[in-house]
Amino acid sequence: MYLFLSNLSLADISFTSTTLPKMIVDIQTNNRAISYSGCLTQMSFFMLFGCLDSLLLTAMAYDRFVAICHPLHYQVIMNPRLCGLLVFLSILISLLVSQLHNSVVLQLTYFKSVDISHFFCDPSLLLNLACSDTFTNNIVMYFVGAISGFLPISGIFFSYYKIVSSILRMPSPGGKYKAFSTCGS
């Protein structure tokens, strides 16, 4: 549990740090331009840490599911090796999704010397600046975004559905309270 929390806090800090320093500098200098390479770098890190955040939350939901629904088997199921593997897979998948978004954007033709007048750079902004046809790239990016958003959310909802249904089957109110307090922490 603490492994997930520490990695989640690191991902959240990094997620915020991808845009906040640039925004503060832009406010101080009254300059909202970002270079093409800076935009690609910011977009890559933003996608990496955003996807990592959702995947770690999914792993934490699975951890809570095992703790509530299978409390006697928790130590066997959620051993340190599996926890490390879940964190590693979260990092790997988020890195792949981030690089897939970057590779889709890099395939297009741009005026590479142009500065982009935003403090935040996202793939749709770069697709709008492209000189070539972006229909296929839009489809790929929205499909990958939908999959990388839908799977973690469905995993979280499924885990918490099983947790709530398991808690509601408990006969004693004290057991329900203890289970809900464990789940809420």
Curated annotation (Swiss-Prot):
Q: Name one GO biological process term.
A: signal transduction
Q: Where is it predominantly found?
A: membrane
Q: Which loops or segments lie on the Extracellular side of the membrane, by the record?
A: 12-42, 106-138
Compartments, record wording: Cell membrane
Q: Which InterPro entries match?
A: GPCR_Rhodpsn, GPCR_Rhodpsn_7TM, Olfact_rcpt
Record's Gene Ontology CC terms? plasma membrane
Gene Ontology terms for molecular function: G protein-coupled receptor activity; olfactory receptor activity
Q: What is this entry's stated membrane topology?
A: Multi-pass membrane protein
Q: Which cysteines are joined by disulfide bonds?
A: none
UniProt keywords (A-Z) are: Cell membrane, G-protein coupled receptor, Membrane, Receptor, Transducer, Transmembrane, Transmembrane helix
Which regions of this chain are Cytoplasmic-facing, per the record's topological domains? 63-84, 161-182
From which domain of life does this come?
Eukaryota
Q: Which PANTHER family match?
A: OLFACTORY RECEPTOR
Q: Which family does it belong to?
A: Belongs to the G-protein coupled receptor 1 family.
Protein function: Possible taste receptor.
* Name this polypeptide is given: Putative gustatory receptor clone PTE01
